[in-house]
């Protein structure tokens, strides 16, 4: 499987040191199998006058059985709870890999409304139900990162 990471620089050797806390799936290295999604991630850097660079990695899914993995097939109550725990710094899980939907602008707005107490969980889930998830994969441990193999990059 080919995976992509959007940034302002090439990342030939991903690490966990530079990952941010309190994001969708917690601290980790985020990639996607969707080139267009990685290009969107580059957009925020390009808007700030930096380069947009998509790094490309090979990943053998057969090794996934060796990893403690959490997968979300849709935006669900479980996904919402996990996102909120991670974003609020309350995640204490030990997953190597987390796979699921990206909180894009529309999804993010719903999550924020719920997080701020302006809508309840039922309303949030109802709003998210019809959103087609973009896919992100978070490599949260060195064990998981060791399975990513850098293949090159391109500047947008």
Q: Language-model segments: which ranges?
A:
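Short, conserved beta-strand segments within well-ordered enzyme catalytic domains
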Residues: 3-5, 30-31, 56-58
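Short aromatic-glycine-(Arg/Gly/Cys) micro-motifs in beta-strand/loop hairpins
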Residues: 1-23
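Short, charged/polar surface micro-motifs in flexible loops or helix N-caps
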Residues: 10, 35-38, 61-65
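Surface-exposed loop/turn and secondary-structure junction residues enriched for glycine/proline
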Residues: 14, 19, 28, 140-142
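Conserved NAD+-utilizing ADP-ribose enzyme module
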Residues: 23-24, 44-156
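Extended catalytic/binding region for NAD+/ADP-ribose chemistry, centered on the ART fold
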Residues: 20-45
């Amino acid at each position: 499987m080919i995976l992509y990471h959007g940034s302002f620089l090439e990342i030939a050797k991903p690490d966990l040191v530079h990952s941010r806390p309190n994001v969708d799936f917690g601290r980790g290295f985020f990639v996607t199998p969707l080139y267009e999604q990685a290009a969107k991630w580059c957009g925020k850097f390009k808007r700030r006058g930096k380069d947009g660079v998509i790094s490309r990695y090979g990943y053998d899914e057969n090794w996934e059985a060796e990893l403690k993995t959490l997968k979300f097939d849709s935006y669900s109550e479980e996904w919402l709870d996990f996102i909120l725990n991670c974003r609020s710094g309350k995640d204490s899980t030990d997953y190597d890999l987390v796979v699921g939907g990206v909180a894009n602008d529309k999804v993010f707005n719903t999550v924020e409304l719920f997080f701020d107490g302006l809508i309840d969980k039922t309303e949030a889930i109802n709003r998210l139900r019809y959103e087609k998830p973009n896919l992100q994969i978070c490599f949260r441990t060195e064990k998981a990162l060791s399975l990513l193999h850098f293949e090159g990059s391109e500047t947008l």
